[in-house]
Curated annotation (Swiss-Prot):
This is Potassium channel toxin gamma-KTx 5.1. It is found in: Secreted. The presence of a 'disulfide through disulfide knot' structurally defines this protein as a knottin. Has the CSalpha/beta fold, which comprises one or two short alpha helices connected to anti-parallel beta-sheets stabilized by three or four disulfide bonds. GO terms for molecular function: potassium channel inhibitor activity; toxin activity. Belongs to the ergtoxin family. Gamma-KTx 5 subfamily. The keyword Disulfide bond applies. Reversibly blocks Kv11/ERG potassium channels. Pfam families: Toxin_17 (PF08086).
Length: 47
């Protein structure tokens, strides 16, 4: 589900978010980034 990676992958506000990106990709998203210590998945299916 969309927010599954948020709870799973805590990350620094600025810095490493590799686990977040991997989690999001496994969940079917294009990747992920870190905002305010939370993982946010990026999904580009708007084409």
């Amino acid at each position: 589900d969309r927010d599954s990676c948020v709870d799973k992958s805590r990350c620094a506000k600025y810095g490493y978010y590799g686990q977040c990106e991997v989690c999001c990709k496994k969940a079917g998203h294009n990747g992920g980034t870190c905002m305010f210590f939370k993982c946010m998945c990026v999904n580009s299916k708007m084409n």
